Regions:
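Conserved P-loop NTPase nucleotide-binding/switch module
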Residues: 83-121, 161-164
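Conserved P-loop
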Residues: 2-97
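Phosphate-binding/switch region of NTP-binding enzymes
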Residues: 147-195
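A short acidic, glycine-rich active-site loop
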Residues: 109-130, 170-174, 178
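Loop/turn-to-beta-strand initiation segments
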Residues: 77-80, 142-149
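Alpha-helical scaffold elements adjacent to nucleotide-binding pockets in ATP/GTP-utilizing enzyme cores
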Residues: 67, 89-92, 135, 180, ...
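Catalytic-core regions built around general acid/base machinery
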Residues: 131-143
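Short, basic, glycine/proline-bearing loop/turn elements
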Residues: 12-18, 50-57, 114-124, 161-165
Length: 195
């Protein structure tokens, strides 16, 4: 068979990978709850009065991965997994990095992601982030589940080389993690209440 005979056409009908970030109280979790048959992996206690299926509040990276593994390996009828929220998950990931690497290369004890120096901690954090994304990819590719990552927004200064600098909203994540997640997602959506 020639390489030209292997060309496929048409749409790829895989479930979507979505990140929705926005200002506080805009309805990000409500958006996730309106997805087809959602189940929430909570990393923050913010679902309030939403009537939605949810795992108990994750207090560690292992709790998050256990929820992903349960959705992968056990029978269920959920169609969407909602991680609420990515920025609170990042805090759990930083704790996991410190658990995995409790000292610097020079033997100094680590108590904060900043203690590694030269942004090494944030680079180390990309490994557990990839583990999470790999697990979510398995849910999407092998279990047919849509993935929604909820994140809060922050305002940051953007130095545009073609125009004047300006403030803009971005996900409240470290820039390396944010870039990794945004590249992984099919859609990156922003929600605001301004008209």
């Amino acid at each position: 068979m020639s390489l030209l005979q292997t060309i496929e056409s048409g749409r790829n009908q895989k479930p979507r990978r979505v990140m929705l970030y926005g200002v506080h109280g805009i309805g990000k979790s409500t958006f996730g709850a309106m997805a087809p048959k959602p189940v929430f992996i909570q990393t923050e206690d913010g679902l309030g009065n939403l009537d939605a299926a949810r795992f108990p509040l994750a207090e560690s990276f292992d709790d998050v991965m256990a929820a992903v593994m349960a959705l992968y390996s056990e029978a269920h009828d959920f169609q969407t997994v909602v991680v609420d929220s990515a920025d609170w998950l990042e805090q759990l990931i930083w704790k996991e990095v410190i658990r995995r690497r409790p000292t610097t290369d020079r033997g100094r004890d680590i108590t904060s992601i900043e203690d590694y120096g030269f942004a090494k901690g944030y680079t180390y954090a990309l490994e557990p982030w990839r583990e999470v994304l790999d697990g979510l990819n398995a849910l999407r590719n092998e279990r047919g589940m849509m993935v929604i990552l909820i994140a809060h927004a922050k305002i940051e200064r953007f130095e545009n080389p073609e125009t004047d600098a300006y403030d803009r909203y971005s996900p409240r994540l470290n820039k390396h993690a944010s870039a990794l997640i945004q590249e992984w997602c099919d859609e990156v959506l922003f929600a605001t209440g301004t008209a």
